[in-house]
A protein has these predicted regions:
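Polysaccharide-binding surfaces and accessory modules of carbohydrate-active proteins
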Residues: 3-6, 10, 14, 24-249
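Contiguous, structured surface segment used for ligand recognition
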Residues: 17
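Loop/turn positions that initiate beta-strands
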Residues: 252-254
Length: 255
């Protein structure tokens, strides 16, 4: 069974797709698509072929990649129970709350009593997509990492634009070539600043200040944060933003 959700604005469309009630993945994020667009055809075009030496199925790059699905990169959630055992949730669909410009998806792992929520909101006035995630547990646990809903990075990009700086030297840009593995920026100072601006721009090849296409990310949090841009062994790319690892001291049930 396939499920599809979409948010439409005057300048962009976001489409998510899920299979077998698993967590969805972003299959399209770009210029507006007509309401009649065949989402099933888009999902089929988005799927990767299986070749020699590969697994029978490619683990999905979902909005919260799961280690339990043999995802080969950075998972979207890393947590432990009160005894320190690593938890590997398998989230399944529970419900959705869809409005014209917002979407809330709820998933749960009944065995571990964990509930995950992903929120998406497209503000028509700014044409920006805001998204955030929540985790609820029936028993106290220790959270190491929880990413905001994860987005794929464009394949037509050969570099990313990151930012650093200092007093009277703000917003210095750095072009970082894409390569296999993780590029990580982290602020553990408890605040944002010139040194670790929580933003990223992904220009497609040939994009300039006045032409071409680019994708922008900004983590709306003025505290410690972490950004991960990863190219997987199979060539797919993901962008994760979240609070700095181990920001939550001690045990808790709501994150």
């Amino acid at each position: 069974m396939s499920q599809f959700w979409r948010l439409d604005g005057p300048l962009q469309t976001l489409i998510l797709a899920a299979e077998q009630e698993r967590l969805p993945q972003v299959i399209y994020w770009g210029p507006p698509l007509p309401a009649s667009e065949d989402c099933a055809a888009l999902a089929a075009a988005h799927a990767m072929d299986v070749t020699g030496g590969m697994l029978d199925a490619n683990p999905e790059l979902s909005i919260c990649p799961e280690a339990s699905q043999s995802f080969p990169g950075q998972p979207g959630l890393i947590c432990r129970d009160a005894q320190g055992r690593v938890l590997h949730p398998k989230f399944r669909y529970v419900q959705e709350l869809a409005q014209e410009h917002s979407l809330c998806l709820t998933y749960a792992d009944k065995d571990l009593d964990l509930t995950y929520e992903a929120h998406f909101e497209l503000t028509a006035s700014s044409n920006m997509i805001s998204c955030w995630s929540r985790l609820e547990a029936s028993q106290p646990l220790m959270l190491h990492w929880l990413a905001a809903p994860v987005f794929p990075a464009p394949q037509l990009s050969d570099a990313m634009m990151s930012f650093s700086g200092r007093w009277i030297g703000e917003f210095q840009t750095h072009s970082i070539p894409w390569r296999p593995g993780i590029h990580k920026r982290e602020s553990r100072s408890g605040r944002s600043g010139h040194e670790h601006f929580p933003g990223l721009i992904l220009p497609e090849i040939g994009a300039r200040n006045t032409l071409g296409r680019a994708y922008g990310f900004h983590y709306g949090w003025s505290g410690g944060h972490q950004m991960i841009a990863e190219e997987l062994p199979d060539g797919r790319r993901q962008i994760q933003f979240g609070h700095a690892c181990d920001s939550h001291n001690g045990l808790a049930q709501s994150f």
